[in-house]
Amino acid sequence: MIRIYTQQTQGQAWLSNHQQKSVVFACGLGFTDTALIPNISAAGATPEARKYTAIADAECICHGFREKAIYPLPPLIVGASPAILSRAILSHYQIPAYLFDTGLWLKPDKNAVDCIDVSGQKARCVSTGKALEFSTVNKLFEQGLTWGETLATQYLNHLFVLGECVVAGTTTALGVLTGLGYDANQKVNSSYIECNHDLKWQIVQTGLKKANLNPNPDPFAVVAAVGDPMQIFVAGMAIALSRTQGVLLAGGTQMLAVYALMERICKYHSLDFDPKNIAVGTTRWVAEDPTGDTVGLAELIGEVPLLATQLSFQTSQYSQLQSYEQGYVKEGVGAGGLAIAAHLAYGATQAELLAMIERTIVPYLAAN
């Protein structure tokens, strides 16, 4: 059910060390105005719908299907929200979940989303070169560290799955990786069946040109220029957690960018973290996406093992799930990481995961 794509020895050691540990899920919700650019993301069929994607996904995570959802899941171009996959696993195994508003389009209604406000702000478009205030980046990082320390004390000897929900987050990931000096062009993924590399690259290049960063920039300055609020918050949380706990950064390109950011922050600001406790975990739809190069990107960053669940929807009776097999949607809201954790911690099989996901999706399909 789990395949190691990079850093085989380290990946095997990480898997062995975290078998049968209880799981805690934490997810950084954020927004970047980059999501409003036409054709930048398929996570919401229109720019207007994409304003609410993270909030609707969070309501799904918190409550599952509700006939009168305050923020209904937005229509996608094809497929079904990955929040449905995450909700199925969280609900079935009663995994504690913490959702953090790092900077959303709007403050969610408390009756819809039980999330923790960490006083962030939504990001401006990457193309501005001024995505976030430096002070906001600093504050979000400190909040991440504090929450990581708090959760590590509350849940001893657990596996922490850290997810994200940021529409257009692969573009901010490309921005941060490029700003840190990685040659990530043509390597990131997308919610589209064919990754829109040229559009992403054009946006990133415009932003970096305006930002005019130093040759060896402070990683906080890189996030302030072309990043998003989730990245810096989750980086802080993962750094703190890694000192004593197992951490699975649940995502593809976006979490590889978070790992690269963590590594650079610790080096630049002389902080400690334990790379042995960290892996990046995603779906095979991301890891094997022929229109990106997640494996190449992981190898470029080095050190961190890239894992992917081998979960398959080929035999699903629902076309919305089968569309994942055709390259649509692929990942989000920690879905791949939670599937990995479900197998590691609770021995979940392919048949069991498919059954629980299909049970969870039925009321959504009936309502539409």
From Swiss-Prot:
Superkingdom assignment: Bacteria
InterPro entries: Nict_dMeBzImd_PRibTrfase, Nict_dMeBzImd_PRibTrfase_arc, Nict_dMeBzImd_PRibTrfase_sf
Gene Ontology molecular function: nicotinate-nucleotide-dimethylbenzimidazole phosphoribosyltransferase activity
Similarity comment: family membership: Belongs to the UPF0284 family.
Protein name per Swiss-Prot or TrEMBL: UPF0284 protein SYNPCC7002_A1742
